[in-house]
Amino acid sequence: MNSICFDTETTGLHPNGSDPDEILTISIIGRDGSVLLDERFRPTVKTEWPHASAVNGIYPEDVADLPTIETAIPRLREIFAGADEVIGYNVGFDLGFLSAVGVRPREDARITDTMKEFTWFMGKRKRYKLVDAADHIGYEWTGRAHGSLADALATLAVQRWLEQWLVAE
């Protein structure tokens, strides 16, 4: 099975509408942790995103001279077309942003939401942040939390931990 794990950082929470938020960075890794794509983009609509910047640390000047996501769409489509499984933390959020730019997983791809699986494991009805799930499993961060590559690696670690736990049961 060809599995990928990915994360995005965005200008906000809403990929659709008259003033849509946009993807600033996307990182995609294979199940073995190899980096398939790790890119930043200049938004085409938004000129500032102070609330998102406070979380993800990406400011307009950081991406002002970068290409737009349009340059990466062929590669994104290729990666998602080859994936039998797509893993993410609150994956619907990220998939919504990809869908807004015309990138979707295959219809027969398994969509694995590590946040939902971790919440089920914990037996609670609240949403666990990725940093909390990673802390719970003793994950040591490589990079800054809320960076797309660091978050993709942490998501994969939590997913692997959950799968090992399920096998042990």
What are these model-derived regions, one by one?
Residues 150:
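Acidic donor-binding loop at a coil-to-helix junction in glycosyltransferase catalytic cores
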Residues 1, 136, 153-169:
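Acidic two-metal-ion nuclease catalytic site recognized across multiple nuclease folds
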Residues 85, 112-116, 161-168:
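Short secondary-structure transition/capping segments
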Residues 1-108, 123-124, 131-146:
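Conserved non-catalytic scaffold segment of RNase H-like nuclease domains
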Residues 111-127:
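Short, flexible loop segments at boundaries between secondary-structure elements
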